């Protein structure tokens, strides 16, 4: 549940009664969500349960969505709207959403942000996406729509601050592609490969 009070969002969660009856003995969705009926609210400094935060974009995805809102506002002759946590959560393209969870407003309805007309790009488009991410970073105005259009669906769901996108291989498997950033002072990709190889040597 999401409630907007004076421009600020308040989140709560409630288990379905039938789900509790069938799953209560063995499945916790989140360490902060206890297995009982009724509304539950995030505690401490958390605004939303980690279960849902994992499905929301991090810095890179939020930057893409914020830039897109600026472009739409410019085209419509209005001030950019401040995006709230629910805007980021619901604005993620369903097919590439991280966090192993999907969202519907109605049990028998479609998944949210499930736009089949703009599917996940194939990995043959990696160079195009890399160039789009480079141009996006160098676009000081933040109003170059063509770069946003190429990056928003494959990249908006991904966490972290680095430019990245999700692509499909020839077998239909999803891959995360990380791109160089103008802020890099080392070859980040090469060092990630080193840590990957070390992990494999350690048996992970």
Regions found by a protein language model. Name each.
Residues 1-204:
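Phosphate/dinucleotide-binding and metal-coordinating scaffold of catalytic cores
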């Amino acid at each position: 549940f999401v409630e907007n009070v004076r421009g600020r969002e308040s989140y709560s969660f409630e288990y379905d009664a039938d789900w509790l009856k069938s799953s209560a003995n063995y499945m916790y969705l989140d360490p902060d969500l206890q297995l009982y009926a009724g509304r539950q609210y995030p505690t401490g400094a958390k605004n939303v349960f980690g279960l849902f935060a994992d499905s929301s974009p991090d810095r890179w995805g939020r930057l893409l969505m914020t830039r897109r809102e600026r472009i739409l506002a410019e085209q419509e002759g209005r001030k950019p709207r401040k995006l709230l946590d629910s805007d980021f959560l619901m604005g993620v393209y369903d097919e590439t959403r991280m966090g192993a969870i999907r969202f519907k407003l109605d049990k028998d309805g479609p998944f949210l942000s499930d736009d089949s007309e703009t599917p996940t790009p194939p990995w043959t488009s990696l160079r195009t996406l890399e160039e789009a991410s480079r141009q996006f970073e160098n676009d000081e105005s933040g109003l170059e729509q063509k770069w946003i259009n190429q990056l928003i669906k494959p990249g908006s769901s991904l966490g972290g601050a680095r430019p990245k996108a999700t692509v499909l291989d020839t077998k239909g498997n999803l891959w995360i592609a990380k791109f160089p950033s103008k802020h890099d002072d080392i070859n980040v990709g090469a060092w990630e490969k080193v840590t990957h190889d070390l992990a494999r040597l350690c048996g992970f």
